[in-house]
Curated annotation (Swiss-Prot):
It comes from Paraburkholderia xenovorans (strain LB400). Belongs to the GTP cyclohydrolase I family. QueF type 2 subfamily. One of its GO terms (biological process) is queuosine biosynthetic process. It is found in: Cytoplasm. It comes from the Bacteria. Substrate binds at residues 80-82, 220-221. Keywords: Cytoplasm, NADP, Oxidoreductase, Queuosine biosynthesis. This is NADPH-dependent 7-cyano-7-deazaguanine reductase.
Amino acid sequence: MTPEQSPLGKASTYTEQYDASLLFPIARKNAREAIGIGAQLPFFGTDIWNAYELSWLNARGKPQIAVATFFVPADSPNIVESKSFKLYLGSFAQTAFESMDAVRDTIRRDVSASCGATVSVHLTAPYKFGKLQMEEFEGLSLDRLDLDTDVYQPDASLLKAALHEAPVEETVFSNLLKSNCPVTGQPDWGSVQIHYVGPQIDHAGLLRYIISYRNHTGFHEQCVERIFVDVLKACKPVKLAVYARYTRRGGLDINPFRTNYNLPMPDNMRLARQ
């Protein structure tokens, strides 16, 4: 299925009775082929989704709530279109379940089927909400740099590295990532952290490159994979990890992580804008 066929950007009828058919899968393949990624992926990782508007009824009719977190493997053939995900989760609102575990298991089954891979699901109960604290990305902020730029479409030629000097290891981040939904044109605001081992990457060029996504249209996952591929090709790091966290839309935030080495999955931190 294509994004144009999805509910995104269209008037929708909201149902409050559970309906798994609302989930709309989109194949990763086409967007990956457009940036030179074939069947052999140059990375592994996960897409972390947080859902803040999940509610259902218990067996006695009393509303229940939870914050849901989904871990979608990067090698899944499909992603779920975000508005369809919102509509799907909304369909739980007037549906009775015996327990929170039953809700979790239902969501895991449905979303895994839509993505074509096993998706991990975690539900945080209200008494644990206090543990959902704000954090910040570790590393050196690129946003401190005072620079000029006028490039607002992705341009890998902005990336420079000291290819003939001794390798370094560093972590940098920026809060200036912005792209746009390819269907609705709505802005997607995010932060991105890059950790690498290899030739020193020019910080000004890297920040200009991140800023260059400002008028780009692409889903969150696709933007992160393009950043990964461009940095890997232009700067030739031996190890590379790219982690982006986007602000929520429709009660959902999406946080893709990609790496080419054995690195633990990142913390599902909550940045200030999330």
